[in-house]
């Protein structure tokens, strides 16, 4: 009974958070999440490369227009994301992971923002 309740709760959480219920709500590890999920994944870990569109070393956030244009550097990380039941995971490589409850997400942006280089016209 508890398992059924938790399963239903997980499916409801996915719908509330805007996550599709593909393959039972699971998402295999990928560095290219579905377009309709970018807003979710990029809100809680905005330094992932898949969240940014870069041209000639300048990068603009794909989902958050209030983010400044940045200079492409080590701020952007090659993340892989996955979802198994209600567990959302960001794999940053080098053994660094951010794991959170999908229905109660916790941003993991601060440590990365320290490396962000905001573009200014004088930089050209």
Swiss-Prot record:
Signal peptide as annotated in the record: 1-28
Induction, per UniProt? Expressed in the early phase of the viral replicative cycle.
Which Gene Ontology cellular component terms are annotated?
host cell endoplasmic reticulum-Golgi intermediate compartment; virion component
Q: Which residues are glycosylated?
A: 64
Keywords in alphabetical order, please.
Early protein, Glycoprotein, Signal, Virion
Q: Which family does it belong to?
A: Belongs to the asfivirus MGF 110 family.
- KW Signal (keyword) present: yes
Write down the species.
African swine fever virus (isolate Pig/Kenya/KEN-50/1950) (ASFV)
Where can this protein be found?
Virion; Host endoplasmic reticulum-Golgi intermediate compartment
Q: List the disulfide bonds.
A: none
Q: Does the keyword section mention Calcium?
A: no
Name assigned to this protein:
Protein MGF 110-4L
The free-text function statement in the UniProt record for this protein reads: Causes the redistribution of lumenal ER protein to an enlarged ERGIC compartment.
Output the InterPro entries linked to this UniProt entry.
ASFV_fam_110
Locate the motif Prevents secretion from ER.
121-124
């Amino acid at each position: 009974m508890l398992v059924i309740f938790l399963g239903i709760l997980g499916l409801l959480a996915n719908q509330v958070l805007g996550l599709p219920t593909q393959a039972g709500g699971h998402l295999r590890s990928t560095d290219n999440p579905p377009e309709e999920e970018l807003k979710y994944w990029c809100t809680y870990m905005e330094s992932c490369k898949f969240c940014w569109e870069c041209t000639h070393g300048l990068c603009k956030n794909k989902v958050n227009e209030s983010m400044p244009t940045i200079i492409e550097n080590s701020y952007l990380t090659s993340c892989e994301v996955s979802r198994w039941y209600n567990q959302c995971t960001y794999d940053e490589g080098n053994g660094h992971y951010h794991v959170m409850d999908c229905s109660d997400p916790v941003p993991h942006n601060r440590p990365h923002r320290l490396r962000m280089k905001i573009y200014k016209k004088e930089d050209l």
